[in-house]
């Protein structure tokens, strides 16, 4: 029951405040740990494809497990003091694990410009949430780009964290964010990360399989009805 209230409270906090720039975010510290492990393991392990894959596998073990154990220990500590403190820390971390407010704001900006039939403004609005050139998009193209991007980001920014929260509270949600952050930093198919990022990328694929499949299915249904 406490997990339910932690998730609900976290969702409300995210809807109201989003991610204030002045507030330290766990993902920032996760990124620092990933960078440290990347540098350190490359120095220690053989500079071969196999050595790099081992380094990536070690990173893919240390960060998620460490995140879960550390956040779980902090939650346990606060619950031992009083259940209210435990609930509050879980609510806070649940809110930080979500990215719903920013996603809703940006997608609504696109919708408003489309409603006004202002194509240049709609292109500009959608350019803030997609990673490709939008200058040549039609009204239909802008709509499809927005739906596809919202579906993709809803999967790893809302649906997956919520699912993790309901199963394992804030510690599991933060663990998911750690996996997602690893993929964002290491999951490139270039010379530097093709081997080191292999296991982190596979782990992210596994963690996202159910939530992303669901959101892509819903997005496909939406696009078919346009």
Model-predicted segments: where are they?
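N-terminal transmembrane signal-anchor/hairpin module of polytopic inner-membrane proteins
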Residues: 2-76
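Hydrophobic alpha-helical membrane-embedded segments
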Residues: 6-21, 86-112
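Juxtamembrane "helix exit" motif at the C-terminal ends of alpha-helical transmembrane segments
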Residues: 2, 67-83, 163-176
């Amino acid at each position: 029951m406490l997990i339910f209230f932690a998730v609900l409270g976290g969702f409300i906090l995210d809807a109201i405040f989003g991610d204030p720039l002045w507030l330290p975010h766990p993902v920032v510290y996760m990124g620092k740990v990933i960078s440290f492990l990347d540098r350190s393991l490359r120095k220690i392990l053989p500079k071969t494809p196999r050595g790099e894959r081992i380094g990536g596998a070690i990173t893919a073990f240390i960060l998620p497990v460490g995140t879960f154990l550390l956040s779980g220990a902090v939650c346990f500590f606060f619950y031992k003091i009083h259940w209210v403190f435990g609930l509050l820390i879980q609510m806070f971390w649940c809110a930080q694990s979500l990215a719903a407010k920013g996603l809703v704001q940006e997608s609504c900006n696109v919708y408003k410009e489309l409603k006004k039939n202002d194509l240049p403004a709609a292109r500009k609005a959608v350019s803030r949430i997609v990673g490709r050139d939008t200058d040549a998009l039609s009204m239909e193209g802008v709509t499809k780009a927005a739906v596809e991007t919202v579906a993709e980001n809803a999967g790893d920014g809302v649906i997956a964290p919520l699912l993790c929260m309901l199963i394992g509270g804030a510690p599991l949600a933060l663990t998911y964010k750690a996996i997602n952050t690893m993929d964002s930093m290491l999951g490139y198919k270039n010379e530097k990360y093709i081997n080191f990022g292999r296991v982190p990328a596979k782990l992210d694929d596994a963690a996202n399989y159910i939530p992303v499949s669901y959101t892509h299915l819903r997005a496909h249904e939406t696009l078919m009805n346009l």
